[in-house]
Each structure stands twice: as structure tokens, then as C-alpha cells.
Amino acid sequence: MDPSGMMNEGGPFNLAEIWQFPLNGVSTAGDSSRRSFVGPNQFGDADLTTAANGDPARMSHALSQAVIEGISGAWKRREDESKSAKIVSTIGASEGENKRQKIDEVCDGKAEAESLGTETEQKKQQMEPTKDYIHVRARRGQATDSHSLAERARREKISERMKILQDLVPGCNKVIGKALVLDEIINYIQSLQRQVEFLSMKLEAVNSRMNPGIEVFPPKEVMILMIINSIFSIFFTKQYMFLSRYSRGRSLDVYAVRSFKHCNKRSDLCFCSCSPKTELKTTIFSQNMTCFCRYSRVGVAISSSKHCNEPVTLCFYSYCLRKIYHFLLWNLKYKIQKSVLFS
């Protein structure tokens, strides 16, 4: 159907009735809503009347072209809007996918961390030994752990022993603090030890004065004293027999007295002359006596050749032997006392 024919066949019509849009750029109050959809210059011609020059056929043709162009423009706009919507949707979808991936990664990391935490807790529980008791939070002043109970019992025992020591040591109750208490106890014990040593020394000295016999000496030196006593007893008996026999009917020649500085002898000591055999015996005995004196570290060194030209009698030797005997006894007693004190 030709729109121009239809328009010619019909009766008279008005363009304003057919085209409801404003003409010549003039709009009414009711056309404000329509202008939002199709505005001025929408179809390329600002004034259809001027384009048709008053010819209805041209006006209809121009109107049809304008309608066709408006529809095609609307389609294009719809296509553009759909394309832009698709782009926006694709961008939003990509962003959503990225967010979902990130959320999934975070969730996976949390799940892995939780799984690792549970595994470590299980391993710790396996490594820890099973406790025989149930741990309960202790009240104030009370304990539930066996180790803490044992420690408390040990401390109570220590405090009891410290109290006993404080009661034993005089003046220790006034001291405050375990360290100071222990210092006081140590000082008191050391003073007691010194007193015991002093009393033991005093007792040994008293016993040595009261019982100076052989039983005081140790068993190693008892044999030496017994041998010396036996030798002296034999020597003194022979000396007495010799002097008694030699003095019968004979006069003893008295020689000048020689005082030996190292022996500290008195000046009233007499020496007697003997027969040649006796002189020979005395010289041999004097040499042996000199060796014995040097061995025993006594300050007496007797020799007939060095100290005097005359033979020495047995009286002089008896005197020296007595001195040696007393010196040995004194030396042994001193050694015994020293060993007892420092042992």
C-alpha cells in the first residue's frame, strides 16, 4: 500500500492531526513528555512544512522517511545499549569470577591452615604422655600437681630442720633470713670444733705427765726402746762389776778434767786410767759410740783421738748414754704429741 495513495484517496486532513510532534520548533505544554523521546531535529529536518513546500505527497514521503529513520535509529541505539550492557556484563562477570577465585583461594588457604593446625595439635597430643590425673585449677593456698605437692613437703621439712637448728644455736632466733641463720650456725660449729681440739690437746698433755711409760708410744717405736733398755741394763751391770773389781787394792789415777762444749758437761767429772787391753776396748767402743751418736742425730760426738789424748773410761760413756736415752725419750714423746695434734 502506498501511503501517498492512501493519503490522496482520503478526505481532507490536517498535518497536525497526523504528526503529533511539534512543528516549526514550537511546543505546547502537553508536548514536554514527548520531547524526551523525539526531540527537535530528530529526523534531520527542522521543519517539514518547509521541506514539502505545501505539497502533501512530499510531506507524506518525508514523514515516512523520518519515521523509518527514527525506527532505524532506535534499533541502533538498542543494539548499542545491548552491546554496552553485554560489555558491562562481561566485565562484571570477569570481576565476579576474579573475586570468586580470590575468595576460593582464601577459603582454601584457611582450610589448609586449619588442617595443618589440627595435624600439629594431634601430633602434640600424641607426643605428650598421658597424665594419670585430671588437671584442676587449684585454689589459693592449695595445690593439685604431684610435683608441687612434693616440693611443698620438701620445703616444710627444711623449715622444720631450720627451726631445730635455731633452737640449738644460742642467739640464732634473733636473726632473720635463711642465709644469715646458716652463717650463724656455721660459725657456732667452727667455734665448737676449735674448743674440742684445744681440750683434746690439753688432755693429751695431762695424760703424758701422769703416765710417761712405754704404753704411751706407738708400737713401731716400742721395740727400739726395749732394745735400748736391754743394752743399757747389760752395760750398766758390766760397768759396775768392772769398777768394783778394779778398785780393790789399787789407786785410781785422776787426770785433768776436760770439759766439752758440745756436751755441756760439768767440770767435776773424773777419768780413770786402765790397762792396755781396757784401753783397746774403750777406743773401739768410742768409735762405735761416735757412729751411734751421729746416726741418732745427738749433739754428742765422742772420739778419743780428736777430743782428748787419754783413754776414756766407761764412766764417761755411761753418762753419755744416759743423756742419749733421755734425749730419745723426749724426742719420741714430742713426735707422738705432734702426730696426735695434727691428725
From Swiss-Prot:
What keywords is this UniProt entry annotated with?
Developmental protein, DNA-binding, Nucleus, Transcription, Transcription regulation
Q: Which domain of life is it from?
A: Eukaryota
The chain positions of domain bHLH read 142-192
**Localization of this protein:** Nucleus
Output the CDD domains linked to this UniProt entry: bHLH_AtBPE_like
Q: Which GO terms describe its molecular function?
A: DNA binding; DNA-binding transcription factor activity; protein dimerization activity
Task: For this entry, list what GO says about its biological process.
Answer: petal morphogenesis; regulation of DNA-templated transcription
Keyword Transmembrane on this protein? Answer: no
| Nucleus is among the record's keywords | yes
Bilayer-crossing regions: none
Q: What is its main location?
A: nucleus
* UniProt xrefs under InterPro entries: bHLH_dom, bHLH_ZIP_TF, HLH_DNA-bd_sf
What Gene3D superfamilies does the database record attribute to this sequence? Helix-loop-helix DNA-binding domain
SMART domains noted in UniProt: HLH (SM00353)
Identify one Gene Ontology CC term for this UniProt entry: nucleus
| Reported function | Involved in the control of petal size, by interfering with postmitotic cell expansion to limit final petal cell size.
On assembly, the entry states:
Homodimer.
PANTHER family for this protein: STEROL REGULATORY ELEMENT-BINDING PROTEIN (PTHR12565), TRANSCRIPTION FACTOR BPE (PTHR12565:SF460)
Under which name does UniProt file this protein?
Answer: Transcription factor BPE
Q: Which organism is it from?
A: Arabidopsis thaliana
Gene that this polypeptide is encoded by: BPE
